[in-house]
Amino acid sequence: MTDHNEKLTAKSIPHSVWSADWLRNAEKQAADSLGLTLYELMQRAGEAAFTLARETYPATSHWLVLCGHGNNGGDGYVVARLAKSAGVAVTLLAQESDKPLPEEAEQAREAWLNAGGVIHSPDIALPENSDLIIDGLLGTGLTTAPRENIAQLIEKANRHPAPSFALDIPSGLLAETGATPGAVIEASHTLTFIALKPGLLTGKARDVVGELNYHALGLEAWLEGQAAPISRFDREDLPRWLKPRKPTSHKGSNGRLVIIGGDHGTAGAIRMTGEAALRAGAGLVRVLTRQENIAPLITARPELMVHELTLASVEESLEWADVIVIGPGLGQQEWGKKALQKVENSRKPMLWDADALNLLAINPDKRQNRIITPHPGEAARLLNCAVSQIESDRLLAADRLVKRYGGCVVLKGAGTIVASQDRECGLIDVGNAGMGSGGMGDVLSGIIGALLAQKLNPYDAACAGCVAHGAAADELAASVGTRGMLASDLFSTLYRFVNPDLKTINHD
């Protein structure tokens, strides 16, 4: 079974993401552009999958192939035929139906039978000596939980000791959303075809996709002529946002940031946000907080300028700062409410996080100059819905947040989504399970705030900040693991990713 604590992605993954619905409708156009039939395209998919499975699991000798009643099953028939011709023992189980197979899948099925293949009922016991499972049960058209008979087969496959290799997408994972409304194949490897689908990168995807691989099936040129609606971002994108500094840059030109928060007992939150902003390159960072927090914060991080939060200090700081971050440790009592009331009408770039979002949910408004960074619980409060609704379609939730609150939205979680009022959308393909601990959001707010202060536009600052944050955590996890990771541990690796021109970054 794959250890899913870390994201597993092969190096060849593209940076464009496409709706599965759009792709299904465009497949024939794509095939026509190369003079291919859909069956020939299916053969390419099967050949790519067989080749990768053979390379990945060279010692396997008995493959169990699970075929559904659609084109995903057709891919499975092609893989089975190629494996059989290569001398691999193959047991093929197929879900039958009263409905006819798609024409190209029927051709693949007939080719399997003509090659001497046998189709077994899915009700039989899975062969104990199978050492690789090929999952071709359900494809990208799935929009609900698998039917009971298919769910039972999925659960049997998951209990089998052999690893699973998913064709296009693990059966039971929704291609548009990454949701898993029912049983789902827990794949060790997934090979997706033609284009990346959103559901492979967000939601529950990381729990079930395993190592994600990609094959364009020869359609690269056609795909380049299409406009991708979603971008996938990882550490390779950092140089496009974070250029080397000019030798004459100084603390004033590197941006002035004010951070507001840290009510009683939450000095740690504001301290982490402040240090993260410094580590991400802000020239000057001022913190407005409770009087009791001033000495501990200055002692812990003397580079911070720390002042008591008063009416006068807020007004003066709003004039002084290039960018405002409010929310970490702010609380929801009168102290925090009054601070937010003073800040909310500023026309300067702002980032609202944590308790600022909880207060925003009570009094919603729309601002073009604001980034909000909710986790799923905060997003649910902002949209007055259940967390399960957020997680069932994270892309839709991000879109709804942008429409209601304006500006730019960072919907945090595994497969963070960044969406803007200009219809930009990015999936952040870094990060790991070690980031599920207190303070990670405070660090992210400081990083994004610092990049805003360095004159990145809100969408770019949000994307670059999320990538640097997650990449720093990935670098740390590679050396010490994910369990026990602290938010402040990221400071030891963050500088490498906000300086992507350094040659010491490990890209493995």
Model-identified regions with their sequence ranges:
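Glycine-rich, charge-decorated loop segments at or immediately adjacent to ligand/cofactor-binding or catalytic sites
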Residues: E103, S171-I185, L357-R367
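N-terminal small/polar loop signature for handling phosphorylated ligands or for N-terminal nucleophile
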Residues: V78-R159, A295-L309, E315-E316, W320
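Conserved acidic functional residues
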Residues: E27, D135, A166-D168, L351-A354
